[in-house]
């Protein structure tokens, strides 16, 4: 109940107060129920996980693997994230992949959705992804869960009335991403596992890149349009306004 209320209040704040507009498509591609990995790109700011939440239904619940330093760098952010819930913070150098695999298994076995942004860090061009990290694909190998790709665009700068776009794509498996080179699930912790994860990361990047490039123009305002409340970039993204 608290989770539903928090999501409703969050939508009221972002769309009603800040006037953010989201063009979200592709829910028809979601598998019935939960138990899948939601792997998203691009990752350009603190707003991105909220767009991932907006892209999917309220239930099943989404748990997001996110950056501890950027998500909890201000007291108000920490309070908001604790109210909304579902954030699994990552602190660089803190834990190994086994902890994240265990967290993903716990979420998936209960019918939830495990989400992360596969670039692994914030920053890069607004209309194309930076190279994907291997970690999410190791999780996919060890859990056997299907992958739902999510394209996100428009969060590189914020102001009142800013437009965003998301696209959910049909589920894919690790075997489908790897293609003809797939020889089954490799031994956990082996070099082969890392090699398979890398091939899958490159394949998903190739799959998402044209979708991101295609939806980004819809988030860009015409030249000369006045930007109201440009300070939202600094407030929500933690960097100077554009």
Please report, for each region that a protein language model flagged, where it lies by residue:
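Active-site phosphate/pyrophosphate- and oxyanion-stabilizing loops and adjacent acidic/basic residues
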Residues: 11, 78-79, 137
